[in-house]
Amino acid sequence: MRKCARIIYNPTSGKELFKRTLPDVLIKLERAGYETSAYATEREGDATLEAERALKRDYDIIIAAGGDGTLNEVVNGIAEQPNRPKLGIIPMGTVNDFGRALHLPSDIMGAVDVIIDDHTTKVDIGKMNNRYFINLAAGGQLTQVSYETPSRLKSIVGPFAYYIKGFEMLPQMKAVDLRIEYDNQVFQGEALLFLLGLTNSMAGFEKLVPDAKLDDGHFTLIIVEKANLAELGHIMTLASRGEHIKHPKVIYEKAKSINISSFTEMQLNVDGEYGGKLPANFLNLKRHIEVCTPKDIYNEELTEDQQVEDGIIEEKPSNEEIIKNNEISE
């Protein structure tokens, strides 16, 4: 029986490269046994609505072709449904944080090959109030860099554009009094920014969460406390090497649920796009979405449960089984 695939793509992403390559993508998927159709988004929110429609038509897989914003919209269209289809990703944005985290090929046909191989990984997603995200949520002036960086600069220098814009914004940064409740702990004080990460890659920084796991049911919470300009510049430099977590002005924690509030207005960034303002409640939805990934995805980025499921390692016996085996051997 042929499987049904629905491609939801942003025709303007990647200088319209996917739009021009679409006929070849459709042929390749058809030859691999997929009955495939495609939908081009026209405005903000289109990908979410189309993903919801695709669910009603019982597609086996939804393929998001575009940048992190398109992917976020597709995830929001399927996250609330109990029977979610598999998610395929063809990264077409400038940075493609989530695609980088999954080590997806940067070329279109390579990404299609990953989908055809049909190896999947169940990954965590986050819920912020009534919307979902798949990579990060953040607050603070510096977190606005992803949607304030000019498109022309991104097209010229790629992810390095965020570094340039980030250093440009440092002198404007002001600390805000925040209350952050996470699991059984509380941070109360002045902070310049906070980040909730689900993967290791955010705004081009691939080592921002050096110990990230895609499926452990926890956010990585990073809080940068009030600091001077020199300290901030040092933290940004350290972040490019994954060494910022040792800085005395950086709080680095793991948490399943987080509540953040402030008496001062603070904008939120969700998967690289404007996400409203505080207050916000965050909840990690463990292994909520099944995503097509390369077969050689790094094992250290997955929990033991996923590695057992993939056949990478054998399941460890329970304490009861160990005791029973010992009794038999005696």
From Swiss-Prot:
Entry's family note: Belongs to the diacylglycerol/lipid kinase family.
Keyword set, alphabetical order: ATP-binding, Kinase, Lipid biosynthesis, Lipid metabolism, Magnesium, Metal-binding, Nucleotide-binding, Phospholipid biosynthesis, Phospholipid metabolism, Transferase
Gene Ontology molecular functions: ATP binding; ATP-dependent diacylglycerol kinase activity; metal ion binding
Requisite cofactors: Mg(2+)
Top class in the EC scheme: transferase
Organism field: Staphylococcus haemolyticus (strain JCSC1435)
Transmembrane segments: none
Catalytic function, reaction form: a 1,2-diacyl-sn-glycerol + ATP = a 1,2-diacyl-sn-glycero-3-phosphate + ADP + H(+)
EC number: 2.7.1.107
Name of the protein in question: Diacylglycerol kinase
Domain named DAGKc: residues: 1-132
